[in-house]
UniProtKB/Swiss-Prot annotation:
It is found in: Plastid, Chloroplast. It comes from Pyropia yezoensis. Belongs to the ycf35 family. The keyword Transcription regulation does not apply. Disulfide bonds: none annotated. The gene is ycf35. One of its GO terms (cellular component) is chloroplast. This is Uncharacterized protein ycf35. It holds the Pfam family DUF1257. Keywords: Chloroplast, Plastid.
Length: 128
């Protein structure tokens, strides 16, 4: 029995999503593709992540953010769904912060991974 799920995320920026997926070591394809949902249905996705069992997962744009589309019964990633979403959110937030600090004239000086899994960023801006 299929457990097709469409999970809303807070992800709105495609380029930051691609950076986050790459950082997680996932190989993704960018184009409109269809993934199998259940026995005879398909669902359109904008980013496709292939799985060995051919029950691929993906991300689809819906109004103002991306949704994760997957059959949870056929989930074949190195992390549980919850851990995957946590890691993806952290990577996405990291790249969002880096991009915003660059826009404001800051430069990343140091990055420290904390014991609790969080990341401490030290940025600097020179005033001229």
């Amino acid at each position: 029995m299929s457990h097709f799920t469409k999970i809303q995320t807070t992800i709105q920026d495609l380029n930051l999503l691609k950076h986050a997926l790459t950082d997680l070591g996932l190989i993704w394809q960018m184009n409109s593709s269809h993934i199998k949902v259940g026995e005879n249905n398909q669902h359109k996705v904008d980013i496709l992540i292939k799985q060995d069992n051919l029950s691929h997962i993906g991300f689809t744009w819906n109004d103002n953010r991306y949704h994760l589309v997957a059959d949870l019964q056929l989930w074949e990633q190195p992390w549980s769904l919850e851990v995957f979403l946590d890691k993806l959110s952290q990577k996405y937030a990291y790249y969002s912060i880096i991009e915003e600090t660059k826009k404001q004239g800051f430069e990343k000086m140091q990055q420290i991974s904390q014991k609790d899994g969080s990341i401490k960023l030290i940025v600097q801006r020179w005033n001229y």
